[in-house]
Regions:
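A feature for loop-to-transmembrane-helix boundaries and adjacent hydrophobic helices
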Residues: 1-301
Length: 301
């Protein structure tokens, strides 16, 4: 694959382009499901933008953690290709979303359920961006795909990760819309378990230059270790959610903040304008209907 293309003299990074595709996809999902969660269009836009920024922040934090961990393991000789690790978006997003729930006027669990399918769609898009950009590539494979950065063919591990993550998105949407006994706040841990199981498997086909990357701890790669940790956390999350009544019933939103009030004012303002427009149109239709009735009576006479 080629990491960049040139259109009308401008060079475009395919990796960054897939992030844009992911953001648009997440917004569309949130837009289509906003009525189900009783959310206005302004809230949908604010939530989508915040989630995207929080995801980038989480990926950046994890990038520094990953670099530091491998630098220690290598004795200070590790030179990272990138300081952004998208796994961090999944791990740190609940923290950022919990903080946001204290100000936005919606509960943490509702917020997570609303954004979860879109979050995993961005992840799927980002992994496909890795394929196009030639990073995070798999082991050498003569039957694989050509990597322009390496000038040889490799196993398309990014493609399979992307497809598996898209499958996770579909499963989450089916659960959200079809499952009758699903508890609010369940979608994210379910998605984490499904994604991390797939990630753990596909890590066996990823290429690592150094032995300390391939065998970081107990024969696992760094990301396999975090996949296991994430699965354990997600299982605990679900157990608490389904078994501890006091936890699942508590309202984590302390009150309406200035941010929530401002968003609602924008929403109510646009809603009021729409109501006035509809009322004016209704009056016009009523007038036309009366005119038609009067004309019909005159013609009969």
């Amino acid at each position: 694959m080629h990491p960049e293309i040139t259109i009308l003299g401008k060079t475009i990074s395919l990796y960054d382009t897939m992030y844009a595709v992911g953001f648009i996809g997440m917004f569309i999902m949130c837009f289509l499901s906003r009525k189900r969660y009783k959310l206005s269009l302004p809230r949908t836009l604010v939530y989508t933008v915040y989630t995207f920024i929080a995801g980038v922040a989480g990926a950046t934090i994890m990038g520094y953690i990953y670099t530091y961990a491998l630098d220690v393991a290598s004795g200070g000789t590790y030179d990272p290709n990138s300081r952004v690790c998208i796994f961090g978006a999944l791990l740190f997003l609940p923290v950022f979303m919990f903080i946001f729930s204290l100000f936005c006027g919606d509960t943490f669990r509702k917020l997570m359920d609303y954004m979860t399918p879109g979050i995993f769609f961005i992840l799927a898009s980002a992994k496909f961006g890795c394929l196009l950009g030639g990073c995070c590539y798999g082991i050498a494979d003569e039957h694989g795909v050509y990597n322009a950065n390496l000038d040889y063919t490799v196993f398309p591990v990014q493609l399979y990760e992307s497809l598996c993550t898209l499958a996770v998105v579909i499963i989450l949407l089916v659960i959200a819309y079809k499952a009758k006994k699903i508890r609010t706040g369940s979608l994210y841990p379910i998605g984490m378990i499904l994604y991390c199981c797939a990630r753990f498997f596909w890590e066996n086909y990823r290429y690592y230059e150094h032995d300390f990357e391939q065998n970081y701890i107990f024969g696992l790669t760094f990301w396999q270790m975090f996949a296991v940790i994430s699965i354990i956390i997600a299982i605990i999350w679900l157990v608490i959610l389904y078994s501890v009544k006091g936890f699942r019933d508590i309202d984590l939103t302390p009150g309406r903040s200035k941010v929530a009030i401002a968003i609602d004012r924008i929403s109510s303002g646009s809603a009021e304008k729409n109501r006035k427009k509809h009322a004016e149109k209704a009056k016009e239709h009523e007038k036309k209907a009366k005119e038609l009735k009067n004309n019909a009576k005159k013609n009969k006479k």
